[in-house]
Structure formats: structure tokens, C-alpha cells
């Protein structure tokens, strides 16, 4: 495995909505794609993977992120050597600051159909989950459950569907100070700010939060490793705003490449078919609940 570190990029930070993702599988045949402009001369034998240095459990510079493992499995399935191009920024900036600048060629971790890139067909689907202590004996499956309004604190990620629904059921204002306390009261307005997935789980374990609601892939690792038994329940996909607009709770996950890199995408789709057993093993080891893909 190769590892390539790049100097810090100095683009101004801006607050944004967070998107989650991973990779996909699809048929299709093509010759090895030509090297993108700016790629090394031996690019056809290397898979340059855009990755965040410190975004657990997705990506970590030591390669222990589950998306790092998926990237390696995909590279091996395409007979390429994985080369990680590391960013010291959150993954939300990888498309703009790395992929679009042709510093790397592939992102593991995008929702299927992300309009900024070409995405492969999904290789797995998962959803948001309610996390609680097992000894609480809670049985919450939907944002429409009235029991939610009896809870003291519910931990959710900023910019997530869970934050939207916390607002919709009228609990966000009273929970806001608590949520900001989890990031030392840093505002996400002028900088990227997010609650660490591990912190959300520790809040449930300690009893500071009655419930956490998060995308299963970002917290499954911590639920699985918790010394206090925790219950993880998929959120029913019936959430909606007061005006009837659906707030999706489940997402297909894909690999992303630049819009002009169709040949590379075709090759990756073929590789994903071959890598599927290994990818499924990685997801199972992580404890991520998977659903049938729909796209």
C-alpha cells in the first residue's frame, strides 16, 4: 500500500450539510482508462484514493477506517496498488479540494447520485439508527413516536436528517445548548463543526443522552465495542417535514470519480463485483446493518 501526504490547502472553510457514503457494484466492460491529467505516468497501475486523515470510523491515516479497508479491497480487485492521498480537512471537502483539482481520482464515501461526481451503482445500503442503553428497554422505531418528547437529551449530528427531524418534532430548541456543549460551543456557522460519533455513543453510555440518532456506518464500531450493552434500531423510513416533504432515513452508498472519468468508473464497477465478498466481510466486521440496495 502506498501513502502520499499533501501540504495543507488554504481554502476558506464554510459550514455545510454533511453527506455520507461509501462504494458500489455494477457490470460493464472497458479497457484500462487513460491516466487523468495531473496523474502520475503509471496511473493505470495505481488507484489514487482521496481520504481524510482523521475522520473515524470512516478514514484514518493508519488505514484502520472501514472505508480505507474497502478502498484497498477495491484496488486489489482492479489489480492496482492503493495510494492514499491524505487531507487534513474533513471528508466533506474532498471533492472540491482534491478530486476536482485532480490530486486523486476516487472517493470512498458518497451518496449514490451525488451530483458533484459520477457515482457507481451502490455496493451497500444502510440507514439512520436509534441508539440506547439496552437496560433502558426502549422500543423506538420512528420519529413519530410520542415517547421521544419525554426524553431529556437526544444526541444528533449537525446538518443531518436527524437534526431536521429533531426540529420538526419541536425538540431542537431545548436540546440545542446540550448539542453545542458536545463541541465546546463552537458554532458550525463559519467553520465545519461536527460531534464525534464516539462522543455521541459515550453520551448514551453515561446516561447524559437518553438516545442518539446517527447514520449506522458512523457509529456501529462504537456500539459494537461498548462495554455497556447498547441497542441499535433502524429508524423507520417514514419521516417527513410538516409540509409533507420526505426526510430520507436510508441511503445507497457509492464510489465517486470525476464527471469525465467514465472509463475509470466502468473499471471500478467491474472491480466492485469481484471485491463484493471482501467488502461484505468488512461491513459485517464493523457491525454495520445493511439493507437491500434500491438504486
Predicted regions: what they are:
Residues 1-13:
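Bacterial N-terminal signal peptides that target proteins for export
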Residues 10-22:
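Bacterial N-terminal signal peptides
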Residues 29-33, 88, 161-182, 186-188, ...:
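Ligand-binding clefts/hinges and TM-proximal coupling segments of bilobed small-molecule sensing domains
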Residues 29-116, 191-194, 285-289:
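Extracytoplasmic small-molecule ligand-binding "clamshell" domains
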Residues 52-55, 125-137, 184-186, 224-272, ...:
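Periplasmic-binding protein-like
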Residues 53-56, 60-76, 130-189, 195, ...:
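Bilobed "Venus flytrap"/periplasmic-binding protein-like clamshell domains
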Residues 72, 76, 81-148, 159-160, ...:
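Acidic, polar ligand-binding/catalytic clefts
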Residues 73, 88-105, 118, 185-226:
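Short helices/loops that flank or line small-molecule/ion binding pockets
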Amino acid at each position: 500500500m502506498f501513502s502520499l501526504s499533501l501540504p495543507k490547502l488554504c481554502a476558506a472553510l464554510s459550514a455545510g450539510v454533511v453527506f455520507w457514503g461509501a462504494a458500489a457494484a455494477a457490470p460493464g466492460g472497458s479497457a484500462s482508462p487513460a491516466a487523468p491529467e495531473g496523474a502520475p505516468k503509471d496511473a493505470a497501475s495505481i488507484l489514487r484514493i482521496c481520504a481524510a486523515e482523521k475522520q473515524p470510523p470512516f478514514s484514518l491515516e493508519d488505514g484502520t477506517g472501514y472505508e480505507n479497508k474497502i478502498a484497498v479491497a477495491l484496488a486489489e480487485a482492479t489489480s492496482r496498488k492503493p495510494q492514499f492521498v491524505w487531507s487534513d480537512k474533513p471528508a466533506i471537502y474532498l471533492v472540491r479540494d482534491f478530486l476536482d483539482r485532480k490530486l486523486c481520482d476516487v472517493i470512498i464515501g458518497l451518496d449514490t447520485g451525488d451530483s458533484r461526481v459520477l457515482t457507481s451503482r451502490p455496493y451497500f445500503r444502510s440507514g439512520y439508527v436509534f441508539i440506547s442503553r439496552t437496560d433502558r428497554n426502549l422500543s423506538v422505531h420512528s420519529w413519530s413516536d410520542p415517547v421521544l418528547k419525554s426524553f431529556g437529551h437526544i444526541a444528533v449530528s449537525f446538518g443531518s436528517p436527524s437534526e431536521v427531524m429533531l426540529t420538526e418534532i419541536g425538540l431542537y430548541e431545548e436540546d440545542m445548548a446540550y448539542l453545542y456543549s458536545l463541541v465546546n460551543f463552537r458554532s458550525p456557522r463559519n467553520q465545519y463543526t461536527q460531534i464525534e460519533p464516539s462522543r455521541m455513543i459515550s453520551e448514551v453510555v453515561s446516561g447524559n443522552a437518553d438516545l442518539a440518532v446517527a447514520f449506522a456506518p458512523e457509529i456501529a464500531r462504537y456500539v459494537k465495542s461498548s462495554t455497556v450493552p447498547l441497542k441499535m434500531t433502524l429508524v423507520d423510513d417514514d419521516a417527513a417535514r410538516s409540509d409533507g416533504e420526505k426526510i430520507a432515513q436510508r441511503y445507497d452508498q457509492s464510489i465517486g470519480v470525476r464527471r469525465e472519468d467514465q472509463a475509470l468508473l466502468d473499471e471500478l464497477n467491474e472491480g466492485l463485483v469481484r471485491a463484493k465478498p471482501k467488502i461484505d466481510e468488512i461491513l459485517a466486521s464493523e457491525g454495520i446493518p445493511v439493507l437491500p440496495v434500491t438504486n
